[in-house]
Each structure stands twice: as C-alpha cells, then as structure tokens.
Amino acid sequence: MSTKAIEIKQQKADVITEQLKNSVSTIIVDYRGLTVAQVTELRKQLREAGVEFKVYKNTLVRRSAAAAGIEGIDEFLTGPNAIAFSTEEVVAPAKIIADFAKENEALEIKAGIIEGTVTSAEDVKAIASLPSKEGLISMVLSVLQAPIRNFAYAVKAVGEQQGGEETAAEEA
C-alpha cells in the first residue's frame, strides 16, 4: 500500500476518533436490505436533528475506537455498518433510528456508545423511549410552576371573595 493511501486512511481514522470523542450519543446500525430511498430518508431525518450519519470501514472504526479509549465495540463491527453521531442530544438519534427501524424492519440497531459507554441494542431502544431534552425540561418547568400557579389562583379567589363581600355590604 502506498504511503499516500496510508496517510488518507490515517486522516479518516483521526476524523472518526474525534467524532467518537465529541459525540454524546453514537448508534451503530446494520443497514443491509434498505433501499437507497430509505437510507436517504433516514439521513434526512437524522440531519434535521443535527445528527451525522456515516458509513465507515469497520477496521477504521476499530482503530478509532481504541484511540478514543472506547472498549467493547469490536464485537458489533461486523458486516456493513452505518454510524450516527450526535454531539448535542443523547435521545434524538436513538429515537429517530428506533422509530425508523419499526417502519423498516431491514434496519437493525447493533449497539450504541452513550457518553463513552458501549451499550447494547436493547439499551439504545430503552433510551429511545425517553422524552427529548426539551420534553424533560418542559416537564420540570411544569412541576416547578404548579405551586406558583396554585398560589396565584388562591390569591385571586380570596380577592374575588373579598370583592363579593364588599359589594354585598354596600347593597345592605
């Protein structure tokens, strides 16, 4: 192999290593059996969520995972794989891929790397069932707002009740 080819492969491996290090959620899937149109649709959905979806050689991914300090991923790197990298959202790629896999049985979730920890396909599917970051924030905010809202309703009711008593006293 020429030194130029080795250099190109090393550059690709460096890119993959950086993606693995910077990613909070990485999902590995087997895409065999999907049509080009289906893969394009999946890429579109992932891109809209800010997730990068790439196909790399398994050897490069193995080297990159070792360089990034990720262990236990080798067993999942067999056959054709595609990898979804998300640097911002843990749940989004898992949710999009799990939903897509329900509609397209040819797509198989193999494993995930969530915040540096290798997880099984079952764990990825469990993460997919969680609400998104925005959903969790809205849940927390509604829980925090409930006591304030109830207090405001109580103050309003007391004010209306006192206003009603004053009107009754004026009429008498």
UniProtKB/Swiss-Prot annotation:
Keywords: Ribonucleoprotein, Ribosomal protein, RNA-binding, rRNA-binding
GO molecular function, one term: large ribosomal subunit rRNA binding
A single cellular component GO annotation: ribosome
Disulphide bridges, residue numbers: none
RNA-binding recorded as keyword: yes
Function, as annotated: Forms part of the ribosomal stalk, playing a central role in the interaction of the ribosome with GTP-bound translation factors.
Subunit structure: Part of the ribosomal stalk of the 50S ribosomal subunit. The N-terminus interacts with L11 and the large rRNA to form the base of the stalk. The C-terminus forms an elongated spine to which L12 dimers bind in a sequential fashion forming a multimeric L10(L12)X complex.
The family this protein is said to belong to: Belongs to the universal ribosomal protein uL10 family.
Name under which the protein is recorded: Large ribosomal subunit protein uL10
Gene: rplJ
